[in-house]
Amino acid sequence: MAGKTRVLLDRPTRRAAILRAAARAFAERGFAATSMDDVAAAAGITRLIVYRHFDSKDALYAAVLQDVRDRLAESSAAFAGRGESVAVRALLAVGREDAAGVTLLLRHAAREPQFASYADEFREQVITYADRLMRLAHAPARVRSRWAAETLVSFVFDALMHWLEDGDPDLDDAFLARVDASLPALVTAWAGVS
């Protein structure tokens, strides 16, 4: 009778695998309903191995959120200079490789009091970016408001989450083109209203 072959991973690779498995488990069950045993099962390892990398469930959840934010920053830098929708392209790229992690950051973390700062800080960065883009596009001053920037960000986040859930990855370029066309159209429509 042959047993399972044990796969030894180096520490960074194991940590990354745990983070991805934890993101899936937390996104599926929520923070409160997910145990470290659930994370271990999702990662195909023992709870002891999870604890070798993370002291607590809180530390693990925070690490998942920070990892997603770090990868979004790296992806944004990689897409820099490729048009105005750098943030959307970065969100989609990371979302395609880790939909659960992006879901935690954009949807779940804001509702978890001990983790809301991760979502709030990220959202604030994107709102500031949206406001800067409106200024660069010479949007009228009456349009450039906190409300407008927040509305654009809400539109992008919701559109992205729905696309990740229901959209065909082969049509990602079409999705990006629609978002690229929609954002200026919204700002232009707002500018036309007195």
Residue ranges of each PLM-predicted region?
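Amphipathic alpha-helical linker/stalk segments
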Residues: 28, 62-89, 130-132
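Alpha-helical DNA-contacting segments of helix-turn-helix folds
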Residues: 58-68, 118-122, 126
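Amphipathic alpha-helical packing segments from all-alpha helical-bundle domains
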Residues: 113-138, 143-154, 174-177, 181-188
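Amphipathic alpha-helical segments used for helix-helix packing
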Residues: 94-117, 131, 158-165
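Basic, helix-initiating cap at the start of DNA-binding domains
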Residues: 1-29, 33-44, 58-62
